[in-house]
């Protein structure tokens, strides 16, 4: 015959198993809500600046990680004047102040999309907007076009020709663009 004490132990054990499963599910869910990036830039000072500047509330991708993707759609979240100086080849300008979600509604939501701006601040906000409307594989380019340029990757002008000119936003932000010759940065 089963004792009352034995039944209580079984009931408590089953309840604890259910609670453990619920807690585990909650931990997994909550950890996915708070995206933490391991993305890095080459300059320790720039890295420190980005850690403070960005909210890190979207998926971030480093320049090294970008190279792992076979096909990518690049969206430029800078202002048109910045884009006109230079941009990542084949990128689509979507802007920031004038960003309109309708400008990207025809994009395939299952494709990998990387959004960039100068350093990642504006593109982080645009990335969040795309996530909210159902884009699944969208990433903020950590360090933006400045880090792209710093690591020697090509940028092109509006004629599609490779250029060394880069819009450095303003003199203060130009400090994060390295390896340039006098006159390569534009404000």
Language-model regions: role of each:
Residues 120:
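Conserved G/P- and acidic residue-centered "switch" motifs that form tight phosphate/ATP-binding loops
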Residues 74-76:
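Structural scaffold elements adjacent to functional motifs in cytosolic proteins
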Residues 17, 33-63, 69-70, 80-111, ...:
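Rhodanese-like catalytic fold shared by cysteine-dependent sulfurtransferases
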Residues 116:
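Short, surface-exposed ligand- or partner-binding patches at beta-edge/loop junctions that are enriched
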Residues 1-45:
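Bacterial Sec-dependent N-terminal signal peptides
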């Amino acid at each position: 015959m089963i004792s009352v004490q034995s039944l209580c132990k079984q009931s408590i054990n089953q309840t604890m198993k259910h609670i453990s499963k619920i807690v585990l599910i909650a931990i997994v869910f909550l950890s996915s809500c708070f995206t933490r990036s391991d993305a890095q830039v080459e300059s320790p000072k720039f890295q420190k600046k980005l850690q403070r500047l960005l909210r890190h509330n979207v998926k971030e991708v480093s320049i090294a990680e970008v190279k792992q993707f076979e096909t990518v759609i690049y969206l430029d979240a800078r202002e048109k004047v910045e884009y006109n100086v230079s941009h990542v080849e084949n990128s689509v300008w979507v802007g920031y102040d004038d960003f309109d979600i309708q400008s990207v509604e025809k994009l395939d939501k299952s494709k990998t999309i990387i959004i960039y701006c100068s350093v990642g601040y504006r593109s982080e906000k645009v990335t969040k907007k795309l996530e909210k409307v159902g884009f699944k594989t969208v990433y903020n380019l950590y360090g933006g076009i400045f880090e792209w340029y710093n690591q020697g990757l090509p940028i092109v002008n509006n004629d599609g020709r490779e250029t060394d000119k880069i819009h450095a936003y303003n003199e203060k932000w130009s400090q994060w663009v390295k390896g340039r010759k006098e006159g390569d940065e534009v404000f």
